[in-house]
Regions:
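Non-catalytic accessory regions of SAM-dependent methyltransferases
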Residues: 1-86
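C-terminal catalytic and target-recognition region of SAM-dependent MTase-like enzymes
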Residues: 14, 290-341
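Non-catalytic substrate-recognition/targeting regions of SAM-dependent transferases
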Residues: 75-76, 83, 99-161, 168
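Conserved class I S-adenosyl-L-methionine
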Residues: 177-183
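Conserved SAM-binding loop of SAM-dependent methyltransferases across substrates and taxa
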Residues: 187-199
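Conserved SAM-binding motif I beta-strand of class I
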Residues: 200-205
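S-adenosyl-L-methionine
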Residues: 212-247
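S-adenosylmethionine
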Residues: 235-238, 242-311
């Protein structure tokens, strides 16, 4: 019997099954069964329910071992978010705690379970609360693309799952002969997808460890990093430099943190400076090119974000994709594709 219920009714959306994981032939894992108005975790006896797998494929792309399983208020459990990370589970909480029943049920899966409190210092790493002690660093698949994941890292474990569909589109929009710039690149996931599409990439981040991690992700996917560009420093200063040099790109990705301070102490706030960032990037865009503009700033509404971006690129076409289907809760991610008409 499941221990997590909504309004007293058990739900069969989830079951513990086998999933994609590099270096482990058949790890047990939590997979989506089907989207429903109520939420629960099912017992392991459903592991051989093949119908569950077929319905799961309609939501999660093939060869994907990382996705959101329970999405807070969207699944009737405000403040609790459960992510599958290959054969590990990450439970994030905001303004609440994991109940004893849920923790017990997570322990019963036999998988390593990690807990991260989102209201605490975002640089703190998750804490393992259950399951066997497996390596904290491992490789996981997303849409057939390999990424290094690190459960001991603070801020994030190496990839933002809510950008999965955007990464796929970046790959589709990239082609041999194209140049793609990924600013605020973190571990270079967008860059890897663009390179797999055939583009030459420039990966830009303020932190050298992130650029080193990005190089590892290229290698994991059979891409020689020496054929790509990596730039350390402030994105705004690099964009100004590219514009002065006349260096342009067919695609540019802008996904800055909500707040940051560069190595000179200059502050960047999305709600105040995003439009200026887009205007800088426009000067580096090839005619007919595209930009992906995103932000998870909760202080900024979708319409305000759209107006801010539109003012920076008058006459350009702006479109917005839906959130991935496993993110059914708060529509927090501001996102716009910009196409040079």
């Amino acid at each position: 019997m499941s221990l997590l219920m909504k309004e007293g009714r058990p739900d069969d959306r989830f079951s513990w099954r086998n999933s994609c994981s590099e270096g482990n032939e058949a790890p047990a894992s939590l997979t989506l069964r089907e989207r429903s108005s109520s939420v629960t975790l099912c017992s392991a006896v459903e592991r051989n329910d093949h119908h569950c797998v077929e319905r799961n494929r309609e939501l999660i792309p093939p060869d994907t071992g990382m996705f959101r399983v329970m999405d807070g208020a969207g699944d009737g459990i405000p403040g609790i978010f459960v992510d599958q990370m290959a054969d590990r589970i990450l439970v994030s909480t905001r303004g609440c705690s994991i109940t004893a029943d849920l923790e017990s049920e997570l322990r019963d899966t036999g998988l390593p379970v990690f807990h991260k409190k989102l209201e605490q210092n975002q640089k703190e790493a998750p804490v393992q609360i259950a399951g066997p002690l497996l390596p904290l660093q491992f490789t996981a698949l997303e849409q057939g693309v390999r990424f290094k994941i690190d459960m001991s890292a603070g801020y994030s474990q190496g990839i933002f799952l809510d950008q999965r569909d955007h990464r796929r589109r970046v790959r589709e929009k990239s082609a041999p002969g194209m140049r793609v710039l990924n600013t605020f690149a973190y571990t270079g996931a967008f860059s890897v997808y663009a390179a797999l599409g055939g583009a030459q990439t420039t990966t830009l981040d303020l932190a050298q460890p992130c650029l080193d991690w990005a190089r590892e992700n290229f290698v994991l996917n059979g891409i020689d990093p020496s054929g790509q560009y990596f730039c350390k420093g402030d994105a705004r200063r690099w964009l100004e430099r590219f514009a002065r040099q006349g260096r342009t790109f067919h695609g540019i990705i802008l996904d800055p943190p909500t707040f940051s301070r560069d190595d000179r102490g200059k502050v960047f706030r999305v709600e105040s400076h995003y439009g200026d960032l887009v205007a800088l990037a426009r000067e580096c865009l090839e005619p007919g090119g595209w930009m992906l503009c995103t932000s998870n700033c909760r202080k900024l509404g979708h319409e305000d974000f759209r107006r801010m971006v539109a003012r920076a690129v008058p006459g350009f076409r702006l479109t917005r994709d839906p959130m991935p289907p496993d993110f059914s809760g708060e529509d927090y991610l501001k996102r716009l594709w910009i196409d040079w008409k």
